Swiss-Prot record:
Signal peptide: none
Keyword Membrane assigned: yes
Pathway given in the UniProt record: Purine metabolism; GMP biosynthesis via salvage pathway; GMP from guanine: step 1/1; Purine metabolism; XMP biosynthesis via salvage pathway; XMP from xanthine: step 1/1
Record-listed guanine binding positions: D110, I153
Subunit relationships: Homotetramer.
Source organism superkingdom: Bacteria
Protein name per UniProt: Xanthine-guanine phosphoribosyltransferase
Membrane topology recorded in Swiss-Prot or TrEMBL: Peripheral membrane protein
Binding site for GMP: D110, S111, G112, K113, T114, W152, I153
GO biological process: GMP salvage; purine ribonucleoside salvage; XMP salvage
Cellular component GO terms held in the UniProt record: plasma membrane
Listed EC numbers: 2.4.2.-, 2.4.2.22
SUPFAM superfamilies per record: PRTase-like
Length: 171
């Protein structure tokens, strides 16, 4: 059993992802999914969970030559606090059906609440994320990298390139 260090700052257990890294990891996800669809290995469509799943979904759809791409907007975070997941925008109902042949892509599964909600809507879809944390891992079918539950992932779309003063020490 681990106890949290009250002196540790939130960024100290951070995993910083660059654009190059998310691109490489998303391509690796595509390679893992290639030929795994239910229609002679093919997938009918990609659905990105917005907003974090959009970049990985674009890369996966390109790599697998999937031209039908839609989004589902699920909000479960307010700043860095996770709350109740709610669907703000659903994908085309005619496309989705029960999810058969659909790849649902997100950047990360954390607690699994977002994927649980979407899986209830589309039980036969295939859920893939680039990164997975242990609590959410049962909700995802395919992922590339697992990180510890207490790691905060800093994605490139959340970051700015600028000088930052050190938190400790000045010399």
């Amino acid at each position: 059993m681990s106890t949290k260090d009250p002196h540790r700052l939130p960024h100290e257990k951070g995993f910083h992802i660059s654009w190059d890294q998310i691109h490489r990891d998303s391509r690796a996800l595509a390679w893992r999914l290639d030929g795994q669809g239910p229609d002679e290995g093919a997938w009918r469509a990609v659905v990105a969970i917005t907003r974090g799943g959009m970049a990985p979904a674009m890369i996966v759809s390109r790599e697998l030559d999937i031209r039908t791409v839609d989004t589902i907007s699920v909000k479960s975070y307010h700043h860095q606090a996770q709350g109740q997941a709610q669907v703000l925008k659903a994908p085309d109902a005619g496309l989705m059906g029960d999810g058969t042949g659909i790849l649902v892509i997100d950047d990360l599964v954390d607690s699994g609440k977002t994927l649980e909600l979407v899986r209830e809507m589309y039980p036969n879809a295939h859920f893939a994320t680039v990164y997975a944390k242990p609590k959410g891992r049962p909700m995802v079918d395919t992922f590339i990298t697992e990180v510890s539950q207490d790691t905060w992932i800093f994605f490139p779309w959340d970051m700015a390139l600028q000088y930052v003063e050190p938190y400790r020490g000045t010399d």
